[in-house]
From Swiss-Prot:
Catalytic-site annotation from UniProt: H311, D370
Name of the protein: Citrate synthase
Regulation: Allosterically inhibited by NADH.
Subunit structure: Homohexamer.
Catalytic reaction annotation: oxaloacetate + acetyl-CoA + H2O = citrate + CoA + H(+)
Source organism of the structure: Rickettsia conorii (strain ATCC VR-613 / Malish 7)
Alphabetically ordered keywords of this record: Allosteric enzyme, Transferase, Tricarboxylic acid cycle
Lineage, uppermost ranks: Bacteria, Pseudomonadati, Pseudomonadota, Alphaproteobacteria, Rickettsiales
Amino acid sequence: MTNENNNDSEFAELKIRGKIFKLPILKASIGEDVIDISRVSAEADCFTYDPGFMSTASCQSTITYIDGDKGILRHRGYDIKDLAEKSDFLEVAYLLIYGELPSGEQYNNFTKQVAHHSLVNERLHYLFQTFCSSSHPMAIMLAAVGSLSAFYPDLLNFKEADYELTAIRMIAKIPTIAAMSYKYSIGQPFIYPDNSLDFTENFLHMMFATPCTKYTVNPIIKNALNKIFILHADHEQNASTSTVRIAGSSGANPFACISTGIASLWGPAHGGANEAVINMIKEIGSSEYIPKYIAKAKDKNDPFRLMGFGHRVYKNYDPRAAVLKETCKEVLKELGQLDNNPFLQIAIELEAIALKDEYFIERKLYPNVDFYSGIIYKAMGIPSQMFTVLFAIARTVGWMAQWKEMHEDPEQKISRPRQLYTGYVHREYKGIRER
């Protein structure tokens, strides 16, 4: 992939052992430029060191742009707030995968294809029965998504012509598997997709309907979940997306790649953070105890951490959190809980106190996307163990867009990070009786 804005006349100079190396500066269309260090190891006989890849761009991408200092998030140039307020999830999915918003005909064809592929193979049901009833839905989902490789053996050696259909299949089947994971975890029968419903309605139907009870979708709840899905659809090169790209760089089949993304997302520092926020609010218990927990958060010797605040990229208010705060109020108002929901009351007071505290201001710790999403889920009747599962439904769109872009990029190679070795130089082996 080449960037038309790159100016080969600009270089950075790196001096190593008295020798100067000229490194090209690659120009971004917006945001920070990048120093190309790809030739350093070959020419200077050394590597760069960047724990956590905080200063490393692993790829060029046209999908998502983030300005953490200004609190900006854009997909293909469109502001996230505009997409959340004016679009729907499958339209955003189309945008991320194809690069442009669809026409009416393109949108209709795309949604029909997603609906057509929402069923999963009946034999997958037997896989669910191998799990104990107490299994976490993320564990079940992780195994089920990886097992799709067995049902689509033709994609073990996929071709460029398979990219789009693969993305559609993945977007369609992940919600079905997610709902099945939930149903199995609570001992209820699986509910089949209903193609007369839209994407978000269908997921709620599979989650909450039973063979003897029809679930009527509340439009406020549906719209809120639609926004949540949009806000979680992609977020540049985060841990799970980078994991998908790294797995994909080896040529692994797309189902295996997405399962690695799900595994990475499950971590409490990534997709599991919204569940941690709910647990934190439960621990705080009442607004009167907020000052106590603020003090605990400031104490470096105290293991307590204020969940839902701060972000590796954002040093301003997360634009997704701003949308979710208002969405949370809309949902609770619809459900008659706006004035008496203890989770919202604690969250709002906690945010207000933290945003006025110099400790948090100096460290630029603002509410992130996880701070309010869990409260919305809980109000909807979605249990906390399903929070990260819903995150995975939304992020599958971003993972597939990034996976597709990676395979279309001629510059991409199999990922192979290097290390700074600090272990023993050499040791002689001794038999066990001599040690």
